[in-house]
Amino acid sequence: MKILILGTAHPYRGGLAAYNERLAFQFVSEGNDTEIFTFTLQYPGFLFPGKTQYTDTESPAKLKITRIVNSVNPFNWIRTGRRIRKLKPDILLIKYWNPLMAPCFGTIARIAKKNKAANTKVICIFDNVIPHEKSIIDRLLTRYFTEGIDGAIVMSRSVGDDLKAFRVCVAPSAVIEA
């Protein structure tokens, strides 16, 4: 099976990157052709709440990680979606954590799945559907994103409950040991 993960990975640091990389390793260990498309720009520097977005560790060996996504450039989203469409993955897996990523991820997903020959399925792993400090724009952005996916995996029951408002097919995630 050909699986493309869209989201945070090396050289970015943190739990999102670690999760995506570990998931990719698991898919590879099961014999799947797996690649991660990560960011050239995840957040503009002035929006990043921490000291740095980047890790100083080596890139994970034996993982294909391509830095291609600019989260704030709509022209890049179109190019990235077209590139994914040409790759014809069986599954495009997106890790979603913030509605600010909805325009980027939603546009890429819609373009990528237009490939009828591959019949790419877009599956999302939701950490959060709506942030704790929610606003009306969060619901609009999340609706845009969820209308472009085929199914979802949620990380908690409360996230699954939040997602029901968007009429998405949900499967709960299994417990993952560290």
Regions found by a protein language model. Give the residues of each.
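A short, glycine/small-residue-rich beta-strand->loop->alpha-helix junction that serves as a flexible
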Residues: 7-21, 44-45, 97-102, 133
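Histidine-centered beta-alpha loop that forms part of the nucleotide-sugar donor binding/catalytic region
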Residues: 8, 95-98, 126-129, 172-178
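N-terminal strand-loop element at the rim of the active site
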Residues: 10-13, 25-84, 159
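Short beta-strand->alpha-helix junction loop in the catalytic core
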Residues: 42, 159, 170-178
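Short N-terminal targeting/anchoring amphipathic segment
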Residues: 66-70, 79-104, 120-125
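Nucleotide-sugar donor phosphate/pyrophosphate-binding loop at the beta->alpha transition
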Residues: 121-123, 128-148
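A short, active-site helix/loop in glycosyltransferases that binds the activated sugar's phosphate group
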Residues: 147-170
